[in-house]
Amino acid sequence: SSVVVGVTDTNFDPTHEELQGKYTYMTSGLTNSNIAHGTSVAITIAGGTDNSLGKSSIGYNTQMQLRGMTYNEILAASYAGAKIINASWVSGCSFSQYAQDVITEAYNNGSLIVASAGNGTTCGGASNLAYPAAYDHVLSVTSVGPQDNHERFPGNSLITHQHNTAVDICAPGYD
């Protein structure tokens, strides 16, 4: 495949059946099969789609780099050829010039950084900015429920996603 996606996260299970043959690189020290966040994100992005197992991904015939959850790893993924770099994590609630410079460098190198806008309790509330999603040159993604609800359970603001001025796109979420 000519498409390489950098997945920056933690807790990948490299032995998972949906990841077999799907990644070209994995930063050492990121494995933990008991916690599924990195594995789940990687499978959604580019897990096996034609193996009659589990769930199909959105990135048929796509390869991944499985990398750590840092700005240095975003830059490393970019220079290693990742055209798309996922960051389904929050590093903080305030702007960092260093982090913005890294994002800009990866962007100028031809990489699109896609980041989750954050969970609603992140940074003090759903309307507050969370980073890296709020940086320039990042495609910030949030979700909405089937009744245009921001909360997983309407009326329960403890389980929600960020909906702020940095959000670029809203995808279907929850059930």
Where in the sequence are the language-model features?
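Second-shell loop/turn segments in exported
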Residues: 29-32, 92
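Short, small-residue-rich loop/turn micro-motifs
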Residues: 59-62, 171-173
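Extracellular S/T/G-rich loop segment that most often corresponds to the catalytic His/Ser-adjacent loop
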Residues: 3-10, 130-175
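Buried hydrophobic packing segments
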Residues: 41-45
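Acidic-leg catalytic submotif of subtilisin-like serine proteases
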Residues: 1-30, 40
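Substrate-binding/access-modulating region of protease and related hydrolase catalytic domains
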Residues: 14, 48-52, 61-137, 143, ...
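Short, solvent-exposed loop/beta-turn-alpha elements that line the ligand-binding surface or hinge
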Residues: 55
